[in-house]
């Protein structure tokens, strides 16, 4: 309910004429009224999840063996399959947020691809520079970072912006 009150927007179908723009914007959420654009609702989803994760991590405390034992995944193959499925599914999430098959949907689709690819490359390059080689786990992590980073902007930036967001997300999440 809080995310709805803060971010709510009637959508493009509510704007039937120029005379109703102010009336519709007055009903919108606070952040929308301040001029924020969140194409696919990624900011709402990921900020809420991040806050919940931080609170949960603070309450649970450090992992047993943190910093002493390797926390490698059980199966890198399944990790890559999972991240690939996530990447493919994210196309529907971002492009589907346009609510119709139009230029915004195509832009969101293309931006999702380029930002995620850029994040994979930047994470892999950063990891190779720091550790001497890139890893499959790093590539999967970079893909998730790129997907999360582009979601709020997928239909609002050009391809250059998507590449910049992806590159920045890959490096920031590697060293963040």
Predicted regions located by residue number:
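Hydrophobic alpha-helical transmembrane bundles of multi-pass membrane proteins
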Residues: 1-176
């Amino acid at each position: 309910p809080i995310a709805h009150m803060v971010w709510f927007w009637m959508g493009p179908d509510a704007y039937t004429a120029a005379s109703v723009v102010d009336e519709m914007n007055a009903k919108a959420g606070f952040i929308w009224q301040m001029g924020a654009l969140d194409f696919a609702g990624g900011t709402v989803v990921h900020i809420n999840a991040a806050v919940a994760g931080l609170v949960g991590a603070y309450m649970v405390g450090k992992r047993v063996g943190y910093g002493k034992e390797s926390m490698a995944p059980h199966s890198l193959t399944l990790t890559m399959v999972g991240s690939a499925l996530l990447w493919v599914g994210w196309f529907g999430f971002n492009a589907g947020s346009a609510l119709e098959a139009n230029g915004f949907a195509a832009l969101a689709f293309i931006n999702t691809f380029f930002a995620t690819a850029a994040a994979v490359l930047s994470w892999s390059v950063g990891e190779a520079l720091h550790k001497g080689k890139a890893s499959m786990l790093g590539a999967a992590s970079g893909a998730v970072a790129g997907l999360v980073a582009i979601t709020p902007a997928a239909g609002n930036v050009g391809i250059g912006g998507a590449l910049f967001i992806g590159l920045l997300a890959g490096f920031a999440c590697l060293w963040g």
